[in-house]
């Protein structure tokens, strides 16, 4: 699995990716997606084995890890498989491990890529989805990079710029000073990617309010 780890971490030259893949009989031009399961504490051996058994030892899928708390799945997609199936698979993995609805375990996945060299991008996207998900979608167990909405944009802004904006808009007011109704409205506004019409519809209030 050292090849897959190095591939995920972007440690290989393009020529090495294809040469080593050829030696290991790994197809280069197939659809793949990277999924990351992140646990609140260090994973044990049984968690890794449970995930592996879910995939039935398929040689085309790779299950590995690059740190203590995560299990990474590099999944090869069958014809007809797309994001809805990946979402379903992520929930199945959480349920199989008995970690569904614990509020502490999350699963994220990047975009589907068509070439082996793009696997590291899908991995980076899944990592970002985990981070953004914790900030903007704390109640979600499964987070897709392609569904992050405005959160993906805000997360990539420089922190000093965000602080300047908050100071400019709110002055000396702290978020703790807002009443519950205002906080719910703001939360719903972000949830709907700053769509005023959809936010007002869900809150049953007029958009001008």
Describe the role of every protein-language-model region.
Residues 1-209:
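Cytosolic nucleotide-utilizing catalytic cores of signal-transduction proteins
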């Amino acid at each position: 699995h050292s090849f897959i780890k190095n591939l995920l971490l972007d440690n290989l030259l393009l020529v090495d990716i294809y040469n080593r893949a050829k030696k290991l009989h790994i197809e280069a031009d197939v659809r793949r997606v990277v999924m990351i399961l992140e646990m609140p504490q260090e994973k044990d051996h049984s968690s890794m084995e449970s995930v592996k058994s879910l995939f039935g030892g398929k040689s085309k899928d790779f299950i590995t890890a690059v740190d203590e708390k995560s299990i990474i799945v590099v999944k090869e997609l069958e014809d007809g498989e797309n994001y809805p199936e990946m979402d379903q698979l992520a929930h199945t993995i959480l349920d199989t491990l008995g970690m569904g609805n614990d509020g502490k375990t999350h699963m994220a996945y990047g975009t589907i890529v068509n070439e082996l060299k793009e696997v590291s991008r899908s991995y980076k996207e899944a990592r970002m989805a985990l981070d953004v998900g914790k900030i903007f979608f704390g109640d979600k167990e499964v987070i897709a990079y392609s569904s992050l909405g405005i959160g993906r944009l805000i997360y990539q802004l420089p922190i000093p710029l965000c602080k300047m904006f908050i100071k400019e808009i709110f002055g000396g007011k702290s978020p703790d000073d807002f009443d519950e109704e205002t906080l719910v409205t703001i939360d719903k506004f972000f949830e709907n990617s700053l769509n005023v019409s959809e936010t007002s519809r869900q809150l049953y209030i007029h958009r001008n309010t």
